[in-house]
UniProtKB/Swiss-Prot annotation:
Annotated CDD domains: EF1_alpha, EF1_alpha_II, EF1_alpha_III
G5, as annotated region: 192-194
Organism: Blastobotrys adeninivorans
Major location category of this protein: cytoplasm
Stated name of the protein: Elongation factor 1-alpha
Annotated localization: Cytoplasm
Taxonomic classification: Eukaryota, Fungi, Dikarya, Ascomycota, Saccharomycotina
Amino acid sequence: MGKEKTHVNVVVIGHVDSGKSTTTGHLIYKCGGIDKRTIEKFEKEAAELGKGSFKYAWVLDKLKAERERVITIDIALWKFETPKYYVTVIDAPGHRDFIKNMITGTSQADCAILIIAGGTGEFEAGISKDGQTREHALLAFTLGVRQLIVAINKMDSVNWSEDRYNEIVKETSNFIKKVGFNPKAVPFVPISGWNGDNMIEATTNASWYKGWHKETKEGKATGKTLLEAIDAVDPPTRPSDKPLRLPLQDVYKIGGIGTVPVGRVETGVIKPGMVVTFAPAGVTTEVKSVEMHHEQLPEGLPGDNVGFNVKNVSVKEIRRGNVAGDSKNDPPKGCDSFTAQVIIFNHPGQISAGYSPVLDCHTAHIACRFDELIEKIDRRSGKKVEDSPKFVKAGDAAIVRMIPSKPMCVETFTEYPPLGRFAVRDMRQTVAVGVIKSVEKSDKGAGKVTKAAQKAAKK
């Protein structure tokens, strides 16, 4: 096996008919974690149903059904390998809560793959009328995704026309530049997801195609296929050197063991013997043990979903949405208010001070009041366009001071990204997204410090 490969997370975006499912399905099918038995089973069913040509998208539909049926997602279904990386597709697009998932999502995407339909008329529809592609690209950029790959799909439907390809590259470059990406750093790859052309092996249908190239701070890279473009992603840095932040997903009471909070380590490291503080609950105690998949761990690192056993704390004292951190190293605190850059997506009316929607930030789900609209800004450059606007509407971006209706723990986006981005939910949809610029933390003295914590401190 040799050295473990680095893990990278990609998110696939694009218009609803761009062929995202087919393309994603193809990569997973050819390079992925689906075992051969499952594939044979699907192929047999496909043949019986007269879907004999076996469309990759159909595999993906089957996987989606499995994924929705099985509560513990078999994430192998959403992984594939490149020579350098293990790649996880964070969200199968087309998902209703795509936007919310990208924000509160299990992980920060390291790279976005934008799939563009190259068919006559399709490209134009995807980019112009339907704002969805733009919205998703803007969202990825706002949430700190700086690496992008553009796959120009359905090239078979335009006979691999060089003119058509160049036209789309030009238009798409303008489009992504408006969003904030640098086109020089973006590989453009012509593909046919349906036929699997130029996805894994270089196409033989386009003698004119000399390959893609990109230039980033890390240097230059070139290649032919989509797989090579994914393999050329700059390796992500994982924040294990930062102080611990672990938002709780659940808290269990387990007979014979006691209280076991569960969650994903976002930054830092959690170890047995560490004294942790839960915010905003204000409870401090010692970590007895850390485990993942029913195995004891010497430490939990960023990205690990862990359960940890804590002493002298009842299930009633801590809950989902609380954040655990190291009591000796920038411990987390609750906040009285925070200031954020908010982009309004799809709200039918005008939003003014006093608006109180629900915020989803990491695992917390709490109503917050838009207390003051400080300024309206240009959503690309971040420059101020208006002081103290009376209201904001869909398409606007603003700096807003927000007050949570009950104690919550958030951080600035620059220091702790997963705790500094949020979705604004109202009318059963995501109406806005935000990144937190500053936090007014509440200094409500130390809360409960357990005997175990005091003992551990003396060691």
